[in-house]
Design a protein with these regions (language model features):
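Conserved beta-alpha junction segments in alpha/beta enzyme cores
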Residues: 21-24, 168-199
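N-terminal glycine-rich "phosphate-gripper" loop used for MgATP/nucleotide binding
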Residues: 75-88, 108
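Short, acidic/small-residue loops that bind anionic groups at enzyme active sites
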Residues: 94-117, 125-131, 254, 258-260
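Internal helical hairpin/lid segments
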Residues: 188-237
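Charged helix-capping and loop-helix junction motifs
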Residues: 56-61, 208-213, 239-247
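ATP/NTP phosphate-donor binding region
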Residues: 1-72
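Conserved anion/nucleotide-ligand pocket segment
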Residues: 123-182
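ATP/nucleoside-binding phosphotransfer catalytic cores, i.e., glycine-rich phosphate-binding loops
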Residues: 229-290
Length: 290
């Protein structure tokens, strides 16, 4: 357990964050860590508005760089998902400085675009996990506490239960992974346990995403696929005739990819941490300290 105060920068490369989140998250950090309260800094860009996005493309990219390239921060935390990371990821990656590699990066859903690019570039403390805005969910305090525990202490209890440090892992939203495959963002997934989750899609769209994912030569080298929760599934007319687990098993069989069962991840407060790579997610907070 680190005795140093962790400094966490929150940025929103996609959609705007609710202003209520900053107050609630900061208060939770104070309650959970009274003797070493993390300094959680919400970049002003999190609250900006530019159409669908939390500021225009350059503002969102620059905010990420402000935190990632600042040596005083230990971690970069995504404010929320939404949509927009794909519009800024290449601009961000081309301007990251060497010190940005000494930080942890945590998010999920749309953030998978940036997590994939960071992992591809050799960053060692990249993880799928709850975002700041998850505090607004029912049970959201537990979700945010989980991410804080991983960022501050690399707490093993925050991890998805099958993550053991011995095997390589990666986790993505299905739609996000399907869209980044075949682009310069695609990471090497050879030998990884690949965990997938989805939200707000009809079964035919889940089926189509899994066709694309499991057809990819890189994905066909994974050690297996695990399915997280698929929530808020929209109606399929007519009924698709298969559920999400049956669809995933079908495409795994077609592609010759081992089906490894269910994963404890999803768009909900029970979403667990999945580090990208072969360990618990890179150096401890002490090692990441400026």
């Amino acid at each position: 357990m680190s005795r140093e105060r962790c400094r966490i920068g929150v940025v929103a490369p996609a959609s705007r964050m609710s202003p209520d989140v900053a107050t609630s998250v900061s208060a939770l950090g104070e309650r959970l860590y009274p003797d070493r309260t993390p300094e959680i800094v919400f970049h002003p860009q999190c609250f900006a508005s530019h159409g669908h996005f939390a500021g225009d493309d350059e503002a969102r990219a620059q905010a990420f760089l402000d935190v990632a390239n600042d040596g005083s921060y230990n971690a970069v935390w995504f404010a929320r998902g939404g949509y927009g990371s794909c519009r800024v990821v290449e601009s961000i990656m081309s301007r990251l400085m060497q010190g940005s590699r000494r930080k942890a990066y945590v998010g999920y859903s749309d953030a998978g675009m940036l997590l994939a690019a960071l992992y591809r570039a050799g960053f060692t403390a990249v993880a799928h996990g709850p975002v700041a805005q998850d505090i607004l969910r029912d049970g959201g305090d537990a979700a945010v506490a989980r991410t804080l525990a991983w960022m501050i202490d690399r707490a093993p209890e925050a991890l998805e239960p099958t993550v053991d440090g011995a095997k390589k892992t990666a986790a993505f939203n299905m739609t996000v992974l399907s869209h980044l495959l075949g682009t310069p963002l695609e990471p090497d997934l050879d030998g990884h346990v690949l965990m997938l989750e989805e939200v707000g899609e009809a079964m035919y769209r889940i089926d189509r995403s899994l066709f694309h994912i499991t057809s990819n030569a890189n994905v066909r080298r994974v050690s297996g696929i695990m399915l997280g929760r698929c929530s808020n599934i929209t109606p399929n007319e007519p009924d698709f005739g298969m559920n999400e687990e049956e669809i995933t098993q079908y495409w795994c069989r077609r592609a010759g990819i081992p089906w490894l069962g269910r994963a404890d991840i999803g768009h909900d407060a029970n979403n667990k941490i999945v580090p990208f790579g072969p360990s618990y997610g890179g150096p401890t907070q002490e090692a990441l300290s400026p």
